[in-house]
Amino acid sequence: MAEKITIARPYANAVFELAQAQKNYDQWSRVLNVFADLARDSEMQILIDDPRYTSEQLIGLFVEIGGDTVTESAKNFIKILADNRRLSVLPEVAALFEQLRAEIEGTLEVEIISAKPLAEEQLNEIASALKRRLGREVTFSRKTDESLLGGVIIRAGDLVIDGSAIGKLNQLAASLLH
């Protein structure tokens, strides 16, 4: 959804600059993830999209549900989003914030999807190769998807490496059709 990302980018940049100035990336990561989870909730989405709910009511909900994680700066941030009817972009703001944070910290979150769970040795080899190629430390999230048949799919930011058996079969089928 390019439109939401476009809308979210200036907010993410502003929060990131504030987090840099305050030197509290962890606090902002926590609060943005709480807010993003709230904005993803189907019942909360109905309230966010309902024009009958005022920005003050929505701010109150986010602050109350956010609890102790909500600082005064975070409350002001939610107020800006609510006043501009932009609470629905919170998941994108959180994701962009984490990308900016990873960039500044020299890390990259990598998603590895494999047909079967990978051994530590295999993960270390993948990590080493990605570190050489991308020049950054990598952290993993792992998923298994038996429909891949074999191999792995690696997602690192905008980079997608499809080394799955099903991916190779799809490439072969596409080349035979053309």
Curated annotation (Swiss-Prot):
Pfam families in UniProt: OSCP
Entry's localization field: Cell inner membrane
Gene3D superfamilies: N-terminal domain of the delta subunit of the F1F0-ATP synthase
Main location: membrane
GO molecular function: proton-transporting ATP synthase activity, rotational mechanism
Source species, domain of life: Bacteria
Role of this protein: F(1)F(0) ATP synthase produces ATP from ADP in the presence of a proton or sodium gradient. F-type ATPases consist of two structural domains, F(1) containing the extramembraneous catalytic core and F(0) containing the membrane proton channel, linked together by a central stalk and a peripheral stalk. During catalysis, ATP synthesis in the catalytic domain of F(1) is coupled via a rotary mechanism of the central stalk subunits to proton translocation. This protein is part of the stalk that links CF(0) to CF(1). It either transmits conformational changes from CF(0) to CF(1) or is implicated in proton conduction.
Quaternary organization: F-type ATPases have 2 components, F(1) - the catalytic core - and F(0) - the membrane proton channel. F(1) has five subunits: alpha(3), beta(3), gamma(1), delta(1), epsilon(1). F(0) has three main subunits: a(1), b(2) and c(10-14). The alpha and beta chains form an alternating ring which encloses part of the gamma chain. F(1) is attached to F(0) by a central stalk formed by the gamma and epsilon chains, while a peripheral stalk is formed by the delta and b chains.
The protein, known as: ATP synthase subunit delta
Species the sequence originates in: Nitrosococcus oceani (strain ATCC 19707 / BCRC 17464 / JCM 30415 / NCIMB 11848 / C-107)
